Every structure is written in C-alpha cells, then in structure tokens.
C-alpha cells in the first residue's frame, strides 16, 4: 500500500518518495528476493531452469508474455509455487481491443471517461473471474494452475468472432 500511495498522476513510481534504504539490485538477483508475489512483467523466458529454484514467492503472476520456460514450470510445480498465467493475467490489451472493435462492452452514449472506466472495469472483472476459476479448480483437483488454465481457457477456432 505504501508504494501505491507514492504513484505520480499517470501511475508511474515516484522514486523521490523511496526511503533511503531502498536498494537497486542487479537484475540477476530479483527472482531470489523474499516476497509473497513475484511479477515478471517485461521479458519472456526470464524464469528458466537456471533460476526457477531460487524463487521464494508462493505465487508468480505472469504480467509479461511467456516469462516462464517449460523447464522452469516443472521446477515451480515441484516447489508448489502457484502461477497466474500470462494469457489470463495480462489479457488487458486484447480485451480492450475486443471491447472497442467487437463491442463486448456496451459504451454507446457514454462520454470518453465513463467509456474508458467501463472497459477497464470489464477487463479487471474478467481477469479476476478467470483467475478465481483457475485457482478454485486447482485447489479442487490438485492440478498445477497452468495446467488448469490451459484446460479451461485454451481457445479454439470456434472462439473467433465473426466479422
């Protein structure tokens, strides 16, 4: 909460608000930090067979596209690290596109600000709903969260909207 309170108007971090004890670590050390939730959010394959066993978080939320290699997945599975998969966690861009192009969110007769808020709310609600479904199913079946997500949400051609 403290970090969130330091945001600047457009959401970026206000580094001037960081405490003097804030430490910038080499990029090779960020995975091994003590934390509850680890969020790889920039590059693919950053969690791999060489570093997955160093992860101390109990949950990885994949905000980047494909940040975890298949070999790392096996290590996370063995270490009981849950994964909120990228194709659910970071579906915001495609959902916003769908909302505008395919009109999956009804925004007619709304001003721009209300329309944007409605689209963001829809996107957040969808991510939360799908994540909840995955984690509830994983808890019920004992399956790895990525396996559940793939089983439940892998698209097929019938999911493609008609144009």
Spell out what each predicted region is.
Residues 22-23, 39, 47, 80:
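Short, functionally important structural connectors and interaction interfaces within domains
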Residues 54-163:
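Adenosine-phosphate binding glycine-rich loop
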Residues 13-16, 34-37, 57-58, 70-72:
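Short linear motifs at secondary-structure transitions and domain/linker junctions
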Residues 25-35, 44-60:
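Rossmann-fold NAD(P) dinucleotide-binding segment
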């Amino acid at each position: 909460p403290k970090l969130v309170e330091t945001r600047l108007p457009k959401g970026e971090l206000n580094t001037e608000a960081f405490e003097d004890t804030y430490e910038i670590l080499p990029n090779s050390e960020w995975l091994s930090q003590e934390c509850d939730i680890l969020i790889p959010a920039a590059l693919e394959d950053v969690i791999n067979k060489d570093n997955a066993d160093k992860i101390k978080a109990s949950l990885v939320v994949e905000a980047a596209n494909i940040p975890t290699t298949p070999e790392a997945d096996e290590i996370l599975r063995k270490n009981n690290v849950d994964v909120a998969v990228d194709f659910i966690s970071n579906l915001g861009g495609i959902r916003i596109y769908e909302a505008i192009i395919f009109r999956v969110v009804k925004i007619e007769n709304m001003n721009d600000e209300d329309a944007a808020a409605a689209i963001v709310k829809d996107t957040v609600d969808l991510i939360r709903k799908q994540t909840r479904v995955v984690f509830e199913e994983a808890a019920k079946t004992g399956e790895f969260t990525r396996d559940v997500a793939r089983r439940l949400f892998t698209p097929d051609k019938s999911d493609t909207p008609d144009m």
